[in-house]
Amino acid sequence: MFLLYEYDIFWAFLIISSAIPILAFLISGVLAPIRKGPEKLSSYESGIEPMGDAWLQFRIRYYMFALVFVVFDVETVFLYPWAMSFDVLGVPVFIEAFIFVLILIVGSVYAWRKGALEWS
């Protein structure tokens, strides 16, 4: 039998954890001073007036390196718990982890062939 009163603590937690950020934004919106002027529209660089053009364009290589780093960082996050419990999980989980590593190797070879790992 499905009883809703067993989930009262969950619903209370959900409502409270949703209400706190909403209240924080509402209170800060009401209490914050609203001042408009030229100082509000200017760029802020460590308290000094910006010299030259404040808009900088980054090369796409930075984003490619960041993307490859995130992929391998996530790989480490997923493989570490598996390595710590390898003796308990057995062969089927080893096969799944092997397939996961193969997919990541295919992805890294693809990134390498596309030139995402070259800095020039």
UniProtKB/Swiss-Prot annotation:
Designated name of the protein: NAD(P)H-quinone oxidoreductase subunit 3, chloroplastic
InterPro entries: NAD(P)H_OxRDtase_bac/plastid, NADH_UbQ/plastoQ_OxRdtase_su3, NDAH_ubi_oxred_su3_sf
Enzyme class: translocase
EC number(s) reported in the record: 7.1.1.-
Gene it is expressed from: ndhC
Single GO term (MF): quinone binding
GO biological-process terms attached to the record: photosynthesis, light reaction
Catalytic activity annotation: a plastoquinone + NADH + (n+1) H(+)(in) = a plastoquinol + NAD(+) + n H(+)(out); a plastoquinone + NADPH + (n+1) H(+)(in) = a plastoquinol + NADP(+) + n H(+)(out)
Family affiliation: Belongs to the complex I subunit 3 family.
Subunit structure: NDH is composed of at least 16 different subunits, 5 of which are encoded in the nucleus.
